[in-house]
């Protein structure tokens, strides 16, 4: 939503401001298509040459994140607190045997079935199930600090992979000004081949070449770089829910009372997604 609004404002102010000061938009509009063939084609080729199909799919998904925004809302954070707390309470009161069916087959679990949105996130499900599976097979003898280190390593690996679209967008932003110069230089070369033409024609050709530099800079700093920043924000926002999972599991393994465990996890959530104290503890009653 805001990305689309930002694009409209950006293009409106740049081209509208130019027209408002008496500039003629027609030469720019006529030059943009062939300049964009060079700049866009070169950028596309560079991205394809430097990445595998997996990264290219992630790159496309990065644009979706820019316009869609974060996946998880306040209700999802409330649900993940309920889900993990229920499993940890079951592990503590009923033992590993009670929790094992739920972590071995989450899709058939009556606990996970209450949270279909969370069940769609395979990273979240694996984080919960793999960690609890580790606790179950160790018969509760694991050092909580060691479990935390294992979870941190897994989350770092996931983040390194998830943040790649933002890095690719930023790399594109860094390259676009240079690709704009490439288009401009080619335009100048073309102009030099027509040096015997009248000044009016040469001026139009030089102006057309300069549109390449203009487009490269505009695309880099007006679109690609802001998109990269927004993509990074969305990825980091969605990753916060995994920290809630870790907080509840580790605090429970340390033997802290469940209310303290839940409040520690709740208070660590950003205010925009943080469930109210009453919502959490009223919802936990009877679970």
Task: Please describe what each predicted stretch is.
Residues 19-163, 237-287:
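Large intracellular
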């Amino acid at each position: 939503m805001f990305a689309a609004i930002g694009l409209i404002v950006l293009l409106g102010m740049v081209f509208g401001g130019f027209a408002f000061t008496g500039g003629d938009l027609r030469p720019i509009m006529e030059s943009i298509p062939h300049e964009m063939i060079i700049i866009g084609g070169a950028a596309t080729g560079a991205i394809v040459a430097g990445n595998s199909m997996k990264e290219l799919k992630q790159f496309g998904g990065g644009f979706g994140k820019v316009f869609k925004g974060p996946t998880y809302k306040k209700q999802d954070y409330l649900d993940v607190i309920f889900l993990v707390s229920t499993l940890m309470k079951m592990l503590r009161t009923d033992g590993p045997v009670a929790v094992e069916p739920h972590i071995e087959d989450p899709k058939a679990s009556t606990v996970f079935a209450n949270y279909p949105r969370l069940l769609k996130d395979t990273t979240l499900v694996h984080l919960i199930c793999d960690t609890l599976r580790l606790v179950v097979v160790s018969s509760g003898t694991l050092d909580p600090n060691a479990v935390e280190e294992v979870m941190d390593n897994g989350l770092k690996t996931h983040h390194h992979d998830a943040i790649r679209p933002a890095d690719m967008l930023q790399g594109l932003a860094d390259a676009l000004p240079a690709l704009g110069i490439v288009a401009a230089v080619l335009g100048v070369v073309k102009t030099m081949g027509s040096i015997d033409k009248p000044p009016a024609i040469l001026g139009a050709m030089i102006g057309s070449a300069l549109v390449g530099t203009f487009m490269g800079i505009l695309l880099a700093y007006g679109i690609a770089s802001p998109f990269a920043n927004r993509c990074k924000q969305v990825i980091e926002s969605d990753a916060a829910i995994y920290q809630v999972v870790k907080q509840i599991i580790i605090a429970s393994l340390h033997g802290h009372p469940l209310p303290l465990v839940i409040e520690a996890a709740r208070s660590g959530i950003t205010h925009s997604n943080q469930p109210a104290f009453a919502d959490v503890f009223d919802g936990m009653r009877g679970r």
